[in-house]
Each structure stands twice: as structure tokens, then as C-alpha cells.
Regions:
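Flavin-dependent oxidoreductase catalytic cores
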Residues: 1-167
């Protein structure tokens, strides 16, 4: 479903000529959404080959997403194959992802498992919440690895000391 690579490259040039200042690219379309939001059975860095080809034909920055791994993204950015790594679902699993990368605490990162437990309900419910829908019993957007996802407004998750003191 969708267009082939050559048609996509031609469209990207049109968008650049029309004034777009960046392209956030993946292989997904409405009918093949799984390329834009790859589930667990899709390979890591699954959009990389096509997006690096896109980078060769346009002069504006190109961002790639799709189960991107930081080491692969870093190497591709260093080599000029793309300009940035697109990150979305990973922040649901671990909101401190970037901090842990910067501090090289790789073993502390809670990786997104691409389960779509929190991501796809966003579309079903036209937003997110921290409740169970009474009509169909579905939970509105809870990450399988991070139960705090979308519940920040309802619950106070701030860590508090057992004994407080005034300093």
C-alpha cells in the first residue's frame, strides 16, 4: 500500500521546493501504519535504508524513526546519512531516556518493547487518560513497562522522603 521509493523521493523534492524546512520520514502510510509505528515483530532501525536514500536527494534536514537504536542513529548522524533520530514511544516507556543516554547509563534504560499498549489506544480514545472506559472496559493508554504513563495528573508520583526536615 502506498507509493514506491522513487515516487517518495520525487515527492520529497517537491516538498523541499515548496518550503518545507525538515522531513520526518518513515515508510508508513495510512494503510501500512506499522512502518510508522513498528510493532515488536518489525526489525530495529526498519526505516533506515530508505531514509538514508532520501537524505541523498534533498538538502533539508532528514529525521528517521522506527525502532531506532541510539548507537545506529549516532553512527548514521556522524556519517551524514541522516540529521536526527525520531523518538516517540521510547519516552512513554522511559521519560528519562535522554538523560540516561547522556550519562551513559545504558543498562538503566527501560526500552520500549513496541507493544502498542499505550500508543494505539490514543487514537481509539481521541486522547489519553488514566481511567478504564466504562463502555468497553479498555484501559486508556498505559505503557506495558511504565504504568505511570498518562496518569501524572491523577496521581502524585513525586518521591517523598519518609522523614522530612527543614534546612
Amino acid at each position: 500500500a502506498g507509493r514506491d521509493l522513487e515516487e517518495g523521493l520525487k515527492a520529497a523534492k517537491y516538498l523541499q521546493d515548496a518550503g518545507y524546512d525538515m522531513l520526518n520520514a518513515d515508510n508508513g502510510t495510512y494503510d501500512s501504519w506499522y512502518w510508522a509505528h513498528p510493532p515488536v515483530y518489525m526489525p530495529l532501525n526498519c526505516n533506515m535504508a530508505e531514509v538514508t536514500r532520501l537524505k541523498e536527494v534533498v538538502e533539508i534536514p532528514v529525521v528517521c524513526a522506527g525502532r531506532m537504536q541510539p548507537d545506529e542513529a549516532s553512527a548514521s548522524i556522524s556519517e551524514g546519512k541522516l540529521d536526527a533520530m525520531g523518538i516517540g514511544r521510547q519516552f512513554l516507556a522511559d521519560p528519562e531516556y535522554i538523560v540516561k543516554l547522556e550519562q551513559e547509563k545504558f543498562s538503566d534504560i527501560l526500552p520500549c518493547i513496541a507493544c502498542h499498549n499505550a500508543c494505539l489506544p490514543i487514537y481509539h480514545y481521541e486522547g489519553v487518560g488514566c481511567e478504564i472506559d466504562e463502555e468497553d472496559g479498555k484501559t486508556q493508554g498505559h505503557c506495558a513497562l511504565n504504568p505511570r504513563t498518562f496518569c501524572e495528573q491523577k496521581y502524585d508520583f513525586e518521591k517523598k522522603a519518609a522523614v522530612t526536615k527543614s534546612i
